Amino acid sequence: MNCSTVSVRLAVAVIALATASFAAAPIAVAQKRPADLETLPPVPTNYTPPKTPWGDYDFSHTYTLDNLADARILFQRPKEYGTRVWVTDEEFARRMKAAEGSDSHFGVRGASTTGTKGLADWMRHSDFAKRTSLLVSPANGRLPPLTPQGQRLYETGRSSWVPGQAFDWVDDFDTWDRCITRGFPASMFPNRYNNGIRIFQSPGYIVIALEMLGTRVIPIGDAAHWPKPLESWMGNSRAHWEGKTLVIETTNIKSGDSATHDPFKRAASPVIVTMVGGAPLDTTPTSPEARTVERLTMTGPNTIMDELTYSDPETYTAPWTAREEWTRDDSYKFYEYACHEGDVQVRNYIVASRAERAKVARGEKPATDNLARFTTDFDHDPGVGAPPPAARPTASNGKEGAGG
């Protein structure tokens, strides 16, 4: 859902989640920055977690991705960094200055929060704060090109993030617009709010509960994946242990695209615009061949390193891999993510879009469309310097709905 919608729908749910949670967040164990800033060291495995009574390593805590989001360590690497995995001291100093400024403006005002609390402290203690992006492969830290078929479906897809998009029915919106799902693996990456992750374990199972839309119940062992025709929004996951690392393989992710008008053939985008540094438009298709391999490793008593590789040969020309650090914070509170309840946005978009087109047909001046800024990178990493000037809204072509 676009920014104006989020502010209406989720104001209460956002209270003290993305920022105040830093107050009690434990300090991470650092993965040291090497001298060669293009080198990506392997995930450290020297820490040995305690075990559950049945012998599995115990990951069962509450974690948050807020640090990554608020520090603006983007999913896709800013082009200024090139193939560097790590920032320089000068670039890190700019990030630190921004974090200290954000912490200094922390406050709670009514149904919202401002600033952050404890962000600069996390950055001082975790070398992940010196990373240039979550994406580590391809080497440039950017998503690989789409295949011709993937590009065609991407360009013809529909969502509330598409400039000039007309809205006539619910199939003109993506799955997150409609509070169904953020998609997979998009649900596993930092968003602008509600970044909590809670792990539960029992013999033979691990449960990954996401604060925003989704709980994954994952068998551990050699159980077979579902047969091919069966699919779900979060896919079908199976896990096994490789030493101290939990490896989760996910297949059977709901396939489809956002260009079709058949609601049963719609699918979520694997990477979405509101991921911090994600991909524009929320219209990337998902084929039946899509799969992920996640490797979860506790690198210290208060951190998990999650390495996720996504492959979909019908959509992307190459697989891509991201790493992210989960910070343990057992005091982090999950609040109900009430998205459908009281939701009037989809109806309002449709009504406003029809009214706008009728107005233009009468020869009246069209409204401005401010969605063009979401078609390219719009998140800003303070490490690269001052942000570029904001683009000014342009007149719509008469197709614009309420998103403008």
Question: Could you describe each region identified by the protein language model?
Answer:
Residues 2-3, 12, 22-404:
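PEST-like low-complexity, intrinsically disordered acidic/proline/serine-rich tracts
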Residues 9-15:
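Sec-dependent N-terminal signal peptides
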